[in-house]
Amino acid sequence: MPVITLPDGSKREFAHAVSTLDVAADIGPGLAKACIAGRVNGELKDACDLIETDAELSIITAKDEEGVEILRHSCAHLLGHAIKQMWPETKMAIGPVIDNGFYYDIDLEHKLTQDDIDALEKRMLQLAKTNYDVVKRVVSWQEARDAFAARGEDYKIAILDENISKDATPALYHHEEYTDMCRGPHVPNMRFCQHFKLMSIAGAYWRGNSENKMLQRIYGTAWADKKALSTHLTRLEEAAKRDHRKIGKQLDLYHMQEEAPGMVFWHNDGWSIFLELERFIRRKLNQYTYQEVKGPLMMDRVLWERSGHWDKYSEAMFTTSSENREYAIKPMNCPGHVQIFNQGLKSYRDLPLRMAEFGCCHRNEPSGSLHGLMRVRGFTQDDAHIFCTDSQVQEEVSACIQMVYDTYATFGFENIVVKLSTRPEKRIGDDAMWDRAEEALKQALRDNNIEFTILPGEGAFYGPKIEFTLHDCLDRAWQCGTVQLDYALPSRLGATYVAEDNSRQTPVMIHRAILGSLERFLGILIEEYAGRFPTWLAPMQVVVMNITDKQADYVEEVVKFFKEQGIRASFDLRNEKIGFKIREHTLRRVPYLLVVGDQEMENKEVAVRTRDGIDLGKMRLEDFATKIHQQISLRSLKLLEE
């Protein structure tokens, strides 16, 4: 007689084993109709799974984030169902949930076209509208293998052979004549999967290994209702307009090419923004009392073995050899910073020692994962490492948090989600050390009035971590900042200091990044601002245009004056109509467009308008320069107004 405890504390007693769906029906028909799955004693279960003992139960519906994720997973199976009806010879690989949607990798000789995708989507909707039940069967490993062998599903067989224990009991989900294998849970009926869209096709290697066969990957998105789907598609349209790759080309900021995959060729205007970001962070480093250092790009393999990176990251490291020695190009800066710390005897009086670097790092990311500035192989980290004592951790972490929030606010990011990853099952150190470390991070967050969620067991083996994820104007999440405690690396690389009692102690190391990769953060900014950078970041802040050749000398004089004032200015003396010039520089997103005619030349003035088309009237050069300087010094996100 299981007793089911609901989230509000109420209890319901049943005479026999019940499913989540049974409990929902006992509460009311509306909830039964909305029930997608259940969380039983903290674990997600299919709505039809039986609960045989006393349990705590949360009923999952499409209003829950977990419910939407489940229906997305079921939409992947629905896609598989439609594919096998249209191309029975297809071999199905994997179909997981991803952010806002799902995909399925398939092995099909026929190369899919957009017309095929449209037809697939139509078939999926036809199937979903029949409202068929999804039937779950838990079988033995051998039964599952036999079922897929009979269907010629080689990839499912490979998953069973390579990833699933023969003692396991896999779950098979039957969508009428189509069968798929999954941990689940899935929707009990396809009426929940009515609001989806297939988005694109791409190539993907089986297992992500370029030595394996190239499969076709079909991406889709799915939502709980029509309105949510429509909102998402509208947001995607806006995101496409803001795509940093497209805007980067339009504004001549950078390019990438096949001969250097994942490496950025910065053009003048893009490099100007990059350097401005560096200058801004450098001022922050000075404000928070950091040393700035520069480590070598390449170090001997022996050092990477001592640090532990060779065992964990060697596949992602670029290597080379010279004079019978093997070297690795650094994928991160931390081992180099420990080497700098180790030069000369350090005392407890020298701590905390804050060491920062704009480190040029390289990681051999899979070619299929490269994506403009967002995923590259060569990147610059605004990386820092703080060497401190145990008692200094909380104060130092608190300062890191303040630095992160100060920085993000400057760029207009105010919606920051914070997560604290705590001790994993496999870890170094005793529980007392982890208790102190985790409490120090929690208290630092509390001291700054930061709300955070805890990710149990998600910390690194060498220490807990805080992650900062910013949300942009399209509510997309970008994980950028991290504060990570490290109790392992200083010890591995022999870092010590002389304590107050003259004993040798190992410092705690705090890894700290704010922007993360400058390349990626610049990509985020391009999309956040749609290329309309605030004045302080804009590569060209002012363009001065003449109406006739008569004003050419004065225009050059004006630009010279602005440049002497430290304002990034250029002129446009082309023999074109002024309306044409204004439109062209508006498309280039230059913040201020200055027009000079006879009257402005005579009065030593400029007619000022913004890229938004706002006419600010005529101003004396000194007055305009003063206003711009004020904007730049305040790092204002807005342009001057009337």
From Swiss-Prot:
Region (Catalytic): 243-534
Quaternary state and interactors: Homodimer.
Enzymatic reactions: tRNA(Thr) + L-threonine + ATP = L-threonyl-tRNA(Thr) + AMP + diphosphate + H(+)
Cell location: Cytoplasm
Signal peptide start and end residues: none
Alphabetic keyword roster: Aminoacyl-tRNA synthetase, ATP-binding, Cytoplasm, Ligase, Metal-binding, Nucleotide-binding, Protein biosynthesis, RNA-binding, tRNA-binding, Zinc
Binding-site residues, Zn(2+): C334, H385, H511
Source taxonomy: Bacteria, Pseudomonadati, Pseudomonadota, Gammaproteobacteria, Alteromonadales
E.C. number(s) listed in UniProt: 6.1.1.3
Cofactor binding notes: Binds 1 zinc ion per subunit.
Job description of the protein: Catalyzes the attachment of threonine to tRNA(Thr) in a two-step reaction: L-threonine is first activated by ATP to form Thr-AMP and then transferred to the acceptor end of tRNA(Thr). Also edits incorrectly charged L-seryl-tRNA(Thr).
Protein name: Threonine--tRNA ligase
CDD domains: TGS_ThrRS, ThrRS_anticodon, ThrRS_core
GO cellular component: cytosol
Domain TGS, chain residue ranges per copy: 1-61
Family the UniProt entry places it in: Belongs to the class-II aminoacyl-tRNA synthetase family.
Record has RNA-binding as a keyword: yes
Gene: thrS
BP term (GO), one: threonyl-tRNA aminoacylation
